[in-house]
Amino acid sequence: MRTRFAPSPTGFLHLGGARTALFSWAFARHHQGVFVLRIEDTDVERSTPEAVQAILDSMDWLGMQPDEGPFYQMKRMDRYAEVLAGMLEAGTAYHCYCSPEEVDAMREAARAKGLKPRYDGTWRPEPGKTLPPVPADRKPVIRFRNPIDGATSWNDMVKGPISFDNGELDDLIIARPDGTPTYNFCVVVDDWDMGITHVLRGDDHVNNTPRQINILRALGATLPEYGHVPMILGPDGEKLSKRHGAVNVMEYDAQGYLPEAMVNYLARLGWSHGDDELFTREQLVEWFDTRHLSKSASQWDPKKLNWVNAHYIKGMDDAELAGRVAPRVERRGGKPQAADLPAIMGLLKDRAETLEQLAEDAMLFCGEYQPAPAELAAQHLTETARAALADFAARARDTEWNRAAISALIKAVLADRGLKMPQLGIPLRVAVTGRAQTPAVDAVLELLGKETVLARLQAL
């Protein structure tokens, strides 16, 4: 088995493309096959090196390294020219000298008759047919001589049997007047040369498939199997777009989503394994079967993605999680190396949905101390609270500094002063962290360290 992913580098890798790549990658891995990456960069005006790199970075982040490639179409122009010449010689392609305006007029005339708009075959050679004079000042396009009779059918791996009447398929342009080949032609030659056996792609390509099948047949090539995956919709049921939030895969990296979570969530958009919502990359490969790909569109759900990401954060080893969060802390001006970041992760991760949230919360321990705003201090640092804090500080100097001992000390101060937990817990937080809300106060004090805690209490 040989599958492929063939993006156009005219922008970032979007979520729909990433999911298609994931399905093709998992399909190949499941069958111990080969996953090929091909960059379809023939749109010279819109293709950029930055977009190519963004695609490669996204696939690397998701862990979908190709077995072969990336191959670039712009480096295969000689091969396309060779195949075009062979098709012209074999009569499966021909030169067409119609201007774009003439073709538009043909289509309008067909519409006026209630027919499907199409090229009328003016330059298509037929036995006994006299072709028009060749214009002296016009370069021709090359058209594929599509079969007129019968139908082109295939058993789609996702949608089931699909058939197109050949009479409704006009003769496709496969090379422009400047000689550059078109998308549908390059795809066919690439799939043929690269021995692609299975093509999984978005269902916006369904109408291209009969044309590509007919070109492959004209070349005498073995046909791959095709599967067309429905699109991803936004939460409102409309086609997923920028107005629904981020659609660039790498934006999710920047926002603090784990690649493990992204792979898990993307796979569940249009594929299922029973009722399993959470699974590893290895389980995806083991379980992947095109029979379990959905025929209907999937809906993007940011809340579900957050839930999946939180699951992976919670289950990750504290030291590994610290390694992923540390650069995000540093970007905020924090000093992760000055704190016990793995222990901090252990304290914070159960509440976090993203690495960015973790990094922000970790600044409590790794960032510069910001005293409480005056209004917050006035609300919580009352005379009663300050007396209790002074008592706590005095006793703390001789207390072993671990969570259990700190908890016991807090309880002792509460008992001796007849206070309830919020009457000391909140003032402690405000005085030591500048915030009224933090994780468990005894754990926070332990991680900040005795010296830091006493210094901040002394400064009141």
Curated annotation (Swiss-Prot):
Q: Which InterPro entries match?
A: aa-tRNA-synth_I_cd-bd, aa-tRNA-synth_I_codon-bd_sub2, aa-tRNA-synth_I_CS, aa_tRNA-synth_I_cd-bd_sf, Glu-tRNA-ligase_bac/mito, Glu/Gln-tRNA-synth, Glu/Gln-tRNA-synth_Ib_cat-dom, GluQ/Sye
**Which EC numbers characterise this protein's activity in its record?**
6.1.1.17
* Annotated binding of ATP, by residue: 242
Q: Where is this motif: 'HIGH' region?
A: 7-17
What residue intervals traverse the membrane?
Answer: none
Name the Gene Ontology molecular function terms of this record: ATP binding; glutamate-tRNA ligase activity; tRNA binding; zinc ion binding
Q: Which top EC class is named for this enzyme in its record?
A: ligase
Q: Name one GO cellular component term.
A: cytosol
Predominant cellular place of this UniProt entry's protein: cytoplasm
Coiled coil segments of this chain:
none
Q: Where is the composition biased (Basic and acidic residues)?
A: 118-127
Q: Could you tell me the keywords of this UniProt record?
A: Aminoacyl-tRNA synthetase, ATP-binding, Cytoplasm, Ligase, Nucleotide-binding, Protein biosynthesis
> What is an example of a Pfam family matching this protein?
tRNA-synt_1c
Q: Where is this motif: 'KMSKS' region?
A: 239-243
Source organism superkingdom: Bacteria
Extract the signal peptide range: none
Q: How does it assemble?
A: Monomer.
Main function: Catalyzes the attachment of glutamate to tRNA(Glu) in a two-step reaction: glutamate is first activated by ATP to form Glu-AMP and then transferred to the acceptor end of tRNA(Glu).
Protein family per UniProt: Belongs to the class-I aminoacyl-tRNA synthetase family. Glutamate--tRNA ligase type 1 subfamily.
Q: What is this protein called?
A: Glutamate--tRNA ligase
Which taxonomic lineage is given here? Bacteria, Pseudomonadati, Pseudomonadota, Betaproteobacteria, Burkholderiales
